[in-house]
Swiss-Prot record:
CDD domains: GT4_PimA-like. GO terms for molecular function: glycosyltransferase activity. The keyword Transferase applies. This is Glycosyltransferase 1 domain-containing protein 1. The lineage of its organism: Eukaryota, Metazoa, Chordata, Craniata, Vertebrata. The gene is GLT1D1.
Length: 346
């Protein structure tokens, strides 16, 4: 089949990485997958022209509101994948909620990353009950073997001679829902006590206004650094070399950065929100914090307790192997896409 796949494709963001992985799964099954950025289209009529020009027989959208709404009414069957902010944020706005409900009426299937995301969607849109499937994200990490960690530290203006250096890495696009400033003050205070701990915030500048605020705050915070986005392989190499990966988001669908850290055998400290708590079991596969002070307390504990670190790393790696298999994800999407074969009247 010739498939149109609409997603939000800001480079090096979670949704873009997911979209590329799903496209690879579908192409491996022999489909032609035309991946387009939903933000490049203003109206369904532009999509109608694209469907005609590309001779698309079916479609898929990642993110119910940004992608899904553009696929309505074209008389080609489509499926949708929940992105995270669609269920966690957009569903709270009446107008967007109604639009997404209509998208779900027309979609042949919908994929949620977690059981809790599926349950939230079913509460919002009860009519979609029978068509929501759960498929967690499949994880495959590819760290760049040639990556130079010392050069990275130099670029980050981190004192490499600091004895027993501990780098905490927060990977996120600079936008409010990721709350990158949540830990900055508390971390900075800790750095002043212990100059060998650093927080590195790494990711693309998504929201320009908010980015300015982040830069201004980081500039005056001792022990906190801000680094722009980088290719996936280099990012995985940074993760592999850091002490721990941090997530401080206000809401999450399913953080690929957390799962990739687990796969690369690096401990995870995550804010205690539903999307994170679905993957991180406290003191088993990672550590969950509810405020900045608790984060610092847990981070200190992790630094001083190698046995805890080892246990978390072993359990995290096993969790990803068991529940985030790339092959299982491939099989699921290749099966679901068959629901789009046949006439629109099915």
């Amino acid at each position: 089949m010739r498939l149109l796949f609409l997603a939000v494709l800001r480079p090096h963001t979670g949704n873009a990485v997911t979209a590329q992985r799903v496209r690879a799964h579908l192409e491996a099954a022999g489909h032609v997958c035309i991946l387009k950025d939903a933000f490049d289209f203003e109206s369904p009529s532009e999509i109608a022209n694209l469907i005609l020009a590309e001779n698309c027989e079916a479609a898929l959208a990642l993110h119910l509101y940004r992608g899904g709404r553009l696929l309505q009414g074209h008389r080609i069957p489509f499926g949708v994948i929940f992105g995270g902010t669609d269920v966690n944020e957009d569903a709270n706005q009446a107008e967007k909620n109604t639009v997404m409900g209509r998208v779900l009426e027309e979609a042949r299937f919908a994929v949620a990353f977690t059981e809790s995301m599926k349950e939230m969607a079913q509460v919002q849109w009860p009519h979609a009950k029978g068509k929501i499937y759960v498929q967690s994200q499949g994880i495959a990490t590819t760290p760049n073997a040639a990556f130079n960690w010392n050069t990275f530290l130099q670029r980050s203006e981190i004192n490499q001679s600091a004895d027993n250096l501990h780098i905490f890495l927060l990977i996120c696009g600079l936008r409010q829902v990721k709350d990158p400033l949540y830990l900055v003050d508390a971390f900075s205070e800790w750095h002043q006590e212990e100059p060998n701990v650093y927080l590195v915030i790494l990711g693309p500048e998504v929201d320009p206004v908010f980015t300015r605020e982040v830069k201004a705050n980081v500039k005056r915070a001792a022990g906190v650094r801000l680094i722009g986005e980088m290719p996936q392989e280099d990012l995985h190499a940074v993760v592999k070399n850091c002490f721990a990966v941090v997530n401080s988001s206000v809401s999450e669908g399913m953080s690929a950065a957390i799962l990739e850290a687990m796969d690369l055998e690096v401990p995870v400290l995550a804010r205690n929100i539903p999307g994170n708590a679905a993957m991180v079991k406290h003191e088993v596969t990672g550590l969950l914090f509810s405020n900045p002070q608790e984060f610092v307390h847990l981070a200190k504990r992790l630094v001083s307790d190698p046995a805890l670190e080892k246990e978390i790393v072993v359990n995290g790696k096993e969790y990803v192997r068991m529940y985030h298999s790339w092959q299982v994800e491939r099989d699921t999407y290749q099966q679901l896409i068959r629901k789009l074969e046949g006439s629109t009247e099915d």
